[in-house]
Amino acid sequence: MASANIHDYIAPGRRAHLVGIGGVSMSPLAEVLHKAGMVITGSDMRNSATVEHLRALGIPVAIGHRGENVQGAELVIRTAAVHDENPEIAAARAAGIPVFERAQAWGAIMRGYKNALCIAGTHGKTTTTSMCTHIIMAARMDPTVMIGGTLPLLGSGYRVGHGDTIILESCEYCNSL
């Protein structure tokens, strides 16, 4: 079996397939990995404006989950909502392709930034992440941001910046960050 350390896979030229790529935290992940020079493919259950946006960036997105969608991938990334019975997860495992959780990927990405802010907790994560984003953007630091709600300043729940700062609203699920 291939290495089970996601840090071995987050590198330019590596091929990742994202299951549920149209999701609120998966689409910015796809953009960040694409911007970092990775070859990204993905799948989602339905077409959407988000899926069309990813396609416009040159990221192929299949509609529907089928085992053949993971062909050529070196790793597969999924959300916790995608179970082992999913045909793409089952096909990846059968082919020896490592499967990682979305939060593991964000954790690996964070390590590539000079400044990483990760907001966690029971209540107020979105508000606190929004406030941090406003402050960092006012300081003209051009951060990459992933937030759990739509921030009017961004017009969405994320932005792919060009600076050395990343701000993430994190989830403590599985202690994966």
Annotate the PLM regions.
Residues 1-105:
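N-terminal leader/targeting and accessory segments in enzymes
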Residues 32, 55, 69, 80, ...:
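Phosphate-binding loop of NTP-binding sites
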